[in-house]
Regions:
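Positively charged n-region of N-terminal signal peptides that target proteins for export
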Residues: 1-4
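Bacterial N-terminal signal peptides
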Residues: 7-14
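Sec/Tat signal peptide C-region and signal peptidase I cleavage site
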Residues: 15-19
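Right-handed parallel beta-helix/beta-spiral solenoid domain characteristic of secreted/periplasmic
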Residues: 20-32, 46, 66-109
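Short, T/G/N/S-enriched strand-turn elements that build extracellular solenoid repeat scaffolds
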Residues: 32-40, 55-64, 69, 117
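Extracellular beta-strand/beta-solenoid scaffold signature
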Residues: 34-35, 57, 81-91, 107-114, ...
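Right-handed parallel beta-helix
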Residues: 44, 70-76, 97-107, 119-132, ...
Length: 201
């Protein structure tokens, strides 16, 4: 017992020492710079998207475990997909132990934020919106975690989806709280899932 503790403690310290913060700011080639950061980020790192309006023509994706991606507020860090040409969603997450917080995803061609096959996904203080108002041509879902475990949606806002603002499907251990869904066909929908706690919305 003592030897296990002795060796594991320095290992934990070493992992924390190598964790870093990575910053991306607005400006030329924002699409390429942000996607590159999402690819190169390492477990334990935090990616900070600085305040600004970022315009994208392609969807973004994250497939690195154990990271945090955060903006500087839903009214300050704006990921704008109005001119999106490719990609089935604004942001696709396929990794475990991820926290996303404090930014907005606007006018995605398809679903705004899709999470698939994740274990441990925290979505905190995020907004998804289609700014042209409710339309059948808007993306189907604002928040769309499926086939996932340990899902937290907290303090989020979903506006204008052509189906559900917040949809959780084929998942388990789910909390949806303190969130707002407006002008969607359905507000919050939990389907084919286990152990869901939905409150204060």
């Amino acid at each position: 017992m003592k030897r296990v503790f002795f060796f594991s403690f320095p290992l934990l310290v070493a992992l924390n020492l190598y964790a870093k913060e990575v910053y991306v700011g607005p400006g030329p080639n924002a699409q390429e710079r942000l996607q590159e950061a999402l690819i190169l980020i390492e477990e334990g790192d935090t990616l900070i998207i600085k305040s600004g309006n970022y315009k994208f023509e392609d969807g973004l994706s994250l497939d690195v475990d154990g990271v945090t991606v955060k903006g500087e507020g839903i009214d300050s860090t704006i990921l704008d997909f109005k001119n999106q040409q490719s990609g089935a969603q604004g942001l696709l997450v396929t990794s475990d132990r991820v926290t996303l917080s404090d930014f907005s995803i606007l006018d995605a061609k398809g679903d705004a934020l899709k999470v698939i096959g994740a274990k441990g996904i925290n979505m905190i203080n995020l907004k998804t919106e289609w700014t042209g108002g409710p339309k059948s041509t808007n993306g189907a879902y604002g928040f769309y975690p499926v086939e996932s475990e340990d899902v937290l949606i907290d303090g989020c806002v979903a506006i204008g989806a052509s189906d559900a603002g917040i949809y959780v499907g084929q998942s388990k251990n789910i909390i949806v709280r303190n969130s707002v869904a407006q002008y969607n066909v359905a507000g919050i929908e939990i389907e084919n899932s286990y152990y869901a706690d939905v409150y204060n919305n």
